Regions:
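Short, hinge-like loop/turn segments at secondary-structure boundaries
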Residues: 117-121
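Gly/Ala-rich beta-loop-alpha elbow adjacent to hydrolase catalytic centers
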Residues: 143-152
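Short, surface-exposed "cap/lid" segments of acyl-processing enzymes
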Residues: 36-108
Length: 155
């Protein structure tokens, strides 16, 4: 199924709204929603990031175009999937897209995390894109929230 610009724009607009809502949730109390998050698998683990593939169980059903979502530094990758009502990854999946998320982890908990540079993040995004292309055989769309968008632009 070819991806039309209108479908992608609508899905990314919805995803942006969900991220804004998710940031508000974080601001007012965190991610404790007692709701199920979307299923994902960690398909790659690197010192700089983990690559999540959401709805991997559906991957054998000819998933749509891959969309790689990039969070900003210091914000949990869970911002893309706080709850079913505010889940960017669920909205993308419902639009027949194949959502992936780059998880940089918590710098204070990751080995060498506090020494990471902006360049390290940009290189990590580039590597994640290569991994998704290798896994799917398809070109990807990148979407980033705040500083994550800048990482996409620079990658």
């Amino acid at each position: 199924m070819p991806l039309s610009p209108d479908v992608l724009a609508a899905a990314l607009k919805a995803a942006t709204s969900y991220v804004v809502n998710a940031v508000e949730v974080l601001r007012f109390g965190g991610l404790q929603t007692d709701e199920e998050t979307s299923p994902y698998e960690i398909v790659a683990h690197r010192p700089m990031f983990r690559l999540r593939r959401y709805f991997a169980q559906d991957a054998g059903e000819a998933p749509g175009t891959p969309v790689v979502l990039i969070p900003p530094m210091m914000i949990s990758a869970d911002v893309w999937d706080v709850s079913p009502a505010t889940s960017a990854v669920a909205a993308l999946h419902a639009a027949d897209l194949d959502p992936w998320v780059v998880d940089f982890g918590s710098p204070d908990l990751e080995d060498g995390g506090l020494e990471r540079t902006l360049t390290d993040h940009v290189v990590a995004v580039s590597e994640a894109v290569d991994l998704v292309v290798a896994a799917t055989g398809r070109s990807v769309h990148l979407a980033g929230y705040s500083q994550g968008g800048m990482f996409c632009y620079q990658a």
